[in-house]
Every structure is written in structure tokens, then in C-alpha cells.
Amino acid sequence: MTAAQVAELASQAEAVPDAGIYQMYQNRSWLWGQNGAGFFAVQRRQFSAWTSDKGKLGYGDGIWFLPGGGKLCFRAKWHGAGGDADALTCFEHRQAGRVVYQRKIPDGDWYVFRSSDRNMADEFMKVKYGDYATWKQNRIKAKP
């Protein structure tokens, strides 16, 4: 399926309700391969993450929230070799049947986030129950 076809299907799909977004992310970590992970805690909607860009480690602390319209956002203060920066990152989710589409807002390309058959290649398979971010984040914070 081409990117244009995925975009067309996503445009016809419905926004995922807030309850559905919450179920997908609550107390789960989104694993970013070797490049980091972000944890979406239920308690105080805390967001904790670590990243690695070209071998340079960094971390982020903040909150995550659901502004409606199928959106998930996290606002964090990021700390790294290049200094500190505040950032707001949002993703939009749309659903048609059991298929969920996702894109980074404002202008990311749509892709299949979760297939109807839960394909192992789906990005959703990288969203795991539990905290896979805080331990690494704490190790990064502890380095002089």
C-alpha cells in the first residue's frame, strides 16, 4: 500500500475516542528501538523518556494528555548534550474497523499504527505494558 493510499484511508477513518487512546498508552512504554523509550504513567499523567541520538544520551520529563480528536500529546523538558529545551509533541490517531492509523502532528505522514491482525511490524507492537524508560533515564541523570 502506498503512502497516498494510507493517507486516503486515514482521512476517511474516525478519530479514536479519548478512552481508546488512554487504553493504548496508560502505564505503557513506547519503545523507540535503540534510540530510546517514553513511559506514559497513569499517576499524575507523568511522561518520562530517554533518547540516544548519534550516541549522545538525553532524557525528558513532563506530562502527557489527550486534547481530543484522537490526539495524544506529551510536553517535556528535554536535557542533553546540546542543552535543555522544552518541546510539545503530538500524534493523531484514526480508526477504521480494527485498523488504527497514526501520524505526527502537524504534518507527519499517516501510517498503519495497528493492523487488524496485529502484525509484528506494526508500530503498536513497540508499545509495551510497563515502565521501560525510567531506569535508563535515571542512569543518564546520574552520569556526571
What does each model-found stretch correspond to?
Residues 1-61, 67-144:
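Lipid interaction determinants
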